[in-house]
Amino acid sequence: MQTFAEIALLREQIRAWRREGRRIAFVPTMGNLHDGHLTLVRKAREHADIVVVSIFVNPMQFEKADDLTNYPRTLENDLAKLNSEGVDLVFTPTPEVMYPQGLERQTFVEVPGLSQMLEGALRPGHFRGVATVVTKLFNMVQPDVACFGEKDYQQLALLRQMTLDMAMDIEIIGVPTVREMDGLAMSSRNGYLTVDERQRAPVLARTMRWVSSQMRGGRTDYSEIIVDANDQLRAAGLQPDESYIRDAVTLQAVSEETQQAVILMSAQLGKARLIDNQVVELTQPAAPVAEAAES
């Protein structure tokens, strides 16, 4: 497994593989890898001869300096895991390599609409940072396919729209959320949970499944469903953040034309912000509006 921190070395190797006619898959990460990330790597291997992984904690997508400083960095362990998975190349740039002129002078990429709505409204600038760094990494790696987790549902939708809008010849593959045995979606931020909080954390997934069951049972009073769901979260000691039921394709409000809806839920538990989602097939005409419930 090769490990490069410099763009020139990365590009030299990519060009060599291209000359050999190799198909390249790419998995961008911020490190602190868990089984969810490794599932992305395995999916990438199914679609290509060469698997490239990046590890870069992107300062452009953090709103709070403390969050950036405290984000877990476990490079040695990450490289060992990726080597065990047979990854061909790991790109580990520094912020100085990725943003040589600093963030203030960096050209940015922003996807209208999807960058500002839902999670984007809660975290201004976050998706601009995601779109910018992924665009730069795509330009460096030039992959045929790129794999992203469905846990970050809005991010996946945004990156699909970005590649379409920018005419990037890259297939974006969404990979189902990997869960712990008790249903908690795997996340690097789960490491922030105390022992007691970890025991309570699966309530988010259970509540989401309850919302899904209500919808599949025919309920269309989505705002009331979300209010009830938030009450369940509070009863378990979680602080509801933003929760929505939206059209699974557009992420706009559910309409009569909606065939698939997505439940998007988030909650604060101690130092960890937990997020999760589930797509639901609608069996009858949808309610016209489904907005966030007040926390």
Curated annotation (Swiss-Prot):
Pfam families, per the entry: Pantoate_ligase
CDD domains linked: PanC
Coiled coil: none
GO molecular function, one term: ATP binding
Keywords, sorted A to Z: ATP-binding, Cytoplasm, Ligase, Nucleotide-binding, Pantothenate biosynthesis
Biological or metabolic pathway of the protein: Cofactor biosynthesis; (R)-pantothenate biosynthesis; (R)-pantothenate from (R)-pantoate and beta-alanine: step 1/1
The organism's place on the tree of life at top rank: Bacteria
Localization per Swiss-Prot or TrEMBL: Cytoplasm
Uppermost EC category: ligase
EC number(s) stated in the UniProt entry for this protein: 6.3.2.1
Active site location: H37
Swiss-Prot/TrEMBL catalytic activity: (R)-pantoate + beta-alanine + ATP = (R)-pantothenate + AMP + diphosphate + H(+)
Binding site for (R)-pantoate: Q61, Q155
Gene3D superfamilies linked to this entry: HUPs, Pantoate-beta-alanine ligase, C-terminal domain
Endoplasmic reticulum found in the keyword field: no
Family: Belongs to the pantothenate synthetase family.
Record text on subunit structure and interactions: Homodimer.
Note: The reaction proceeds by a bi uni uni bi ping pong mechanism.
Protein name per UniProt: Pantothenate synthetase
Lineage: Bacteria, Pseudomonadati, Pseudomonadota, Gammaproteobacteria, Vibrionales
Gene name in the database record: panC
